[in-house]
Amino acid sequence: MKNISEFSAQLNQTFDQGEAVSMEWLFRPLLKMLAEGDPVPVEDIAAETGKPVEEVKQVLQTLPSVELDEQGRVVGYGLTLVPTPHRFEVDGKQLYAWCALDTLMFPALIGRTVHIASPCHGTGKSVRLTVEPDRVVSVEPSTAVVSIVTPDEMASVRSAFCNNVHFFSSPSAAQDWLNQHPESSVLPVEDAFELGRHLGARYEESGPTNGSCCNI
């Protein structure tokens, strides 16, 4: 099985071919705003990132996975206000994530402690975690694992990647799913957390940049 660095390198290479490229200056600020628990207006994103409103609108229109409400406000991109199986509680606010790896990756990007609850994809048994920005505090059950896929293309990050990245209560609980997805793997939660840190590193230095440019 691949090690963490190999998974990270392969996934980053695939992300570079898809919608994730457009998010390097946008993703972390957007996550922090979504973590407040309210829809995020385009104008707020522009103010936070230093980009023109029209440019932010154009980028959002190119992202097939972004979730917008009727007013055109962002309600989800990785972290979402729309219910999913992956419950993500931060500062008492009930949010959700698109996949199991998101729940482990996002605490570092938003700088907050998160309480996570998600059903085992094989048995339905609840998997519960507390994750701080720099460590996994607790996992119940301790045998929990996360499925990882490495798709060849990532035109839509949610359909190509997120929809196949689940919690399982144990490796044995994941076996039937792995038999059906032979190109996939499972990682212990601690290893999946480290993978999330590797993948999140590309966004950690992002900040306001004025004008159009290069990361889009």
Swiss-Prot record:
Q: Which SUPFAM superfamilies match?
A: NosL/MerB-like, Winged helix' DNA-binding domain
Instruction: Look up keyword Lyase and say if it applies.
Output: yes
User: Which GO molecular-function terms appear in the entry?
Assistant: alkylmercury lyase activity
By its UniProt entry, which Pfam families does this protein fall under? HTH_15, MerB
Q: Which InterPro entries does the record cross-reference, listed alphabetically? A: MerB (IPR004927), MerB_HTH_dom (IPR024259), MerB_lyase_sf (IPR053717), WH_DNA-bd_sf (IPR036390)
Keyword flag Lyase: yes
- Cite the entry's keywords alphabetically: Lyase, Mercuric resistance, Mercury
Q: Could you give a single Gene Ontology term from the biological process aspect?
A: response to mercury ion
Quickly give the catalysed reaction. an alkylmercury + H(+) = an alkane + Hg(2+)
Listed EC numbers: 4.99.1.2
User: By its UniProt entry, which Gene3D superfamilies does this protein fall under?
Assistant: 3.30.450.410
Give a short account of what the protein does. Cleaves the carbon-mercury bond of organomercurials such as phenylmercuric acetate. One product is Hg(2+), which is subsequently detoxified by the mercuric reductase.
HAMAP family given for it?
MerB
Q: Which family does it belong to?
A: Belongs to the MerB family.
Please give the name of this protein. Answer: Alkylmercury lyase
Q: From which organism does this entry originate?
A: Staphylococcus epidermidis (strain ATCC 12228 / FDA PCI 1200)
The record's gene field reads merB
